[in-house]
């Protein structure tokens, strides 16, 4: 009997070995399945909770309250409740009925890449947004969703997306480099004709994409932005914005919201020009985005990126349209709201530096008005601005004065004239001939005897031009001083008045000099000992008292 059960000692050893191998194989297979198990993010979901964008409320135990508080501190919204709202909840159609009558030509003509950059995003909230994109977007349009995990990725989330959502391309940053850098990384991988940037806590609504694409198909230098509604941080209720608004900014770069101009209001629901992107959700032609250089690589973490891209788009030949027939709901997180706060009120030093970069590159001489309201930012150090300035010159972008006067006249009427200094206006007289004045005759600058009227008055303009009527003093490539018709573009040879030496300086360190022999003007290397380079500007004392005599010294072209 014993031999039948175990056989020889050799047979017994073989039996034990086979048993161990099978056991180990089963154990490894089981543990591997455990480690790669797909988390069911619908485990806690309650059917119809939050359906149609309605408020969601649940009774909570003490344990639930503690858990909810911890998650709220981490994610800045009610993540506990989000776990109980279905990932594929439906929302109402919030569009104007007129939108339903519009036929769009975008389907089957372009492809779209959605770019989402996240930092420690709550998985359920992110997935709900991704599912809304997939269910509310035509498969003919949606080429891919590029999801960039900016440091500390959630492995369960990554695994779920990998197995359940093959349309999503996931990129993992080894360390957090900020949302701006993550967005640039995602855009670099995207291959669709049009890029649509979203954030990780939003939901799109029915018919949201074609209205954003249509204006871009008509003009690929158009950037479009939907009407951004709010999703409650506490109840996840979808709250429709009652009336479209115009986003603007003041001299502190704080957001202000203005009513639409009458023409835009009467044309609703047609798209209308917007002076600035809110920046959380927008669409842009991929080639045009990279033609503009994307975002300034010197912008770190977050903040200032929406303003930078807005000014870049407008000043470099594009336009921004708000699209009422496209609606997207956003959860407004506290840190994102802080990132868009005026830099003088912003607690983040990096955000302050970001805004300073934008100001120094794009606001031209008007940056001095910004510094009057934000003096502590004047002396902040920032990385080299050579690249964004070179890009601006290469693209032949327009001046901020053009933006102020042409893009946002309504905004100008509200605030862009507020706080502006009156620039010096007066006669310009050479020290060597104090009874003579600088003037223009026959299109040429001349020195002639002064009149008692204002006929010889000159203005040192906000664009650092010496202006007389509609003519400006300019310098040609041979350093000859001439008079040309003033333009709204930035001068290649800006002028400033050196109060200490009473000289007008342009074209580097060259000074306006009277040629006594020819009774004309030349441009020579500045020399404080040369009396012919000294000029009396009759209103310069008032200018000095306003602490802005160096206005053109600090302008960087």
Curated annotation (Swiss-Prot):
Disulfide bonds join 99-325, 316-397, 437-450, 472-486, 511-526. GO terms for cellular component: Golgi apparatus; Golgi membrane. Residues 109-215 are annotated as: Catalytic subdomain A. Its main location: Golgi. GO terms for biological process: protein O-linked glycosylation. Keywords: Disulfide bond, Glycoprotein, Golgi apparatus, Lectin, Membrane, Signal-anchor, Transmembrane, Transmembrane helix. The keyword Transmembrane helix applies. It is a single-pass type II membrane protein. Signal peptide: none annotated. Probable inactive glycosyltransferase. There are two conserved domains in the glycosyltransferase region: the N-terminal domain (domain A, also called GT1 motif), which is probably involved in manganese coordination and substrate binding and the C-terminal domain (domain B, also called Gal/GalNAc-T motif), which is probably involved in catalytic reaction and UDP-Gal binding. The ricin B-type lectin domain binds to GalNAc and contributes to the glycopeptide specificity. This is Putative inactive polypeptide N-acetylgalactosaminyltransferase 11. It comes from Drosophila melanogaster. The lineage of its organism: Eukaryota, Metazoa, Ecdysozoa, Arthropoda, Hexapoda. The gene is pgant11.
């Amino acid at each position: 009997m014993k031999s039948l059960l175990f056989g020889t000692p050799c047979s017994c050893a073989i039996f034990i070995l086979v048993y161990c191998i099978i056991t180990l194989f089963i154990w490894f297979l089981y543990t591997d399945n455990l480690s790669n198990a797909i988390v069911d993010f619908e485990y806690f979901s309650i059917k119809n909770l939050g359906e149609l964008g309605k408020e969601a409320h649940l009774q909570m135990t003490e344990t639930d309250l503690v858990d909810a508080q911890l998650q709220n501190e981490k994610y800045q919204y009610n993540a506990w409740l989000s776990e109980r709202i279905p990932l594929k909840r439906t929302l109402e159609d919030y569009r104007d009925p007129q939108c339903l009558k519009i036929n769009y030509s975008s389907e089957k003509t372009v492809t779209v890449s959605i770019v989402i950059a996240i930092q420690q995003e709550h998985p359920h909230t992110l997935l709900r947004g991704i599912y809304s994109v997939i269910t509310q977007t035509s498969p003919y349009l949606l080429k891919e969703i590029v999801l960039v995990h900016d440091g500390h990725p959630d492995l369960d989330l990554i695994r779920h997306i990998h197995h359940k959502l093959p349309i999503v391309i996931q990129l993992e940053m080894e360390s957090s480099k900020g949302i701006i850098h993550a967005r640039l990384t995602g855009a670099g991988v995207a291959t669709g004709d049009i890029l649509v940037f979203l954030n990780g806590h939003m939901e799109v609504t029915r018919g949201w994409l074609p209205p954003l694409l249509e204006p871009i198909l008509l003009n690929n230098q158009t950037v479009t932005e939907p009407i951004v509604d709010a999703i409650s941080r506490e109840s996840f209720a979808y709250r429709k914005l009652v009336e479209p608004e115009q986003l603007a900014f003041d001299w502190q770069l704080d957001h202000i919201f203005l009513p639409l101009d009458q023409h835009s209001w009467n044309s609703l629901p047609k798209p209308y020009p917007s002076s600035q992107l809110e920046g959380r959700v927008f669409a842009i032609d991929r080639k045009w985005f990279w033609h503009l250089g994307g975002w300034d690589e010197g912008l770190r973490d977050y903040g200032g990126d929406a303003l930078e891209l807005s000014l870049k788009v407008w000043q470099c030949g594009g336009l921004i349209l708000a699209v009422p027939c496209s609606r997207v709901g956003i959860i407004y997180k506290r840190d994102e709201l802080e990132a868009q706060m005026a830099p003088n009120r912003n607690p983040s030093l990096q955000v302050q530096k970001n805004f300073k970069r934008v100001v120094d590159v794009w606001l031209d001489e008007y940056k001095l008005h910004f510094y009057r309201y934000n003096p502590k930012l004047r002396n902040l150090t920032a990385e080299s601005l050579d690249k964004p300035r070179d890009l601006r010159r290469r693209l032949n972008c327009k001046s901020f004065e053009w933006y102020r006067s042409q893009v946002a006249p309504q905004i100008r009427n509200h605030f862009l004239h507020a706080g502006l200094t009156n620039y010096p206006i007066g006669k310009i007289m050479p020290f060597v001939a104090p009874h003579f004045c600088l003037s223009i005759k026959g299109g040429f600058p001349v020195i002639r005897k002064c009149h008692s009227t204002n006929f010889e008055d000159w203005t040192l303009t906000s664009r650092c031009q010496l202006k007389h009527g509609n003519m400006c003093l300019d310098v040609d490539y041979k350093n000859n001083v001439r008079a040309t018709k003033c333009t709204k573009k930035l001068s290649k040879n800006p002028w400033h008045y050196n109060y200490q030496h009473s000289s007008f300086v342009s074209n580097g360190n060259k000074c306006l000099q009277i040629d006594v022999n020819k009774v004309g003007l030349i441009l020579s290397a500045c020399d404080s000992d040369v009396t012919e380079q000294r000029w009396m500007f009759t209103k310069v004392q008032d200018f000095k008292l306003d602490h802005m005599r160096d206005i053109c010294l600090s302008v960087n072209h």
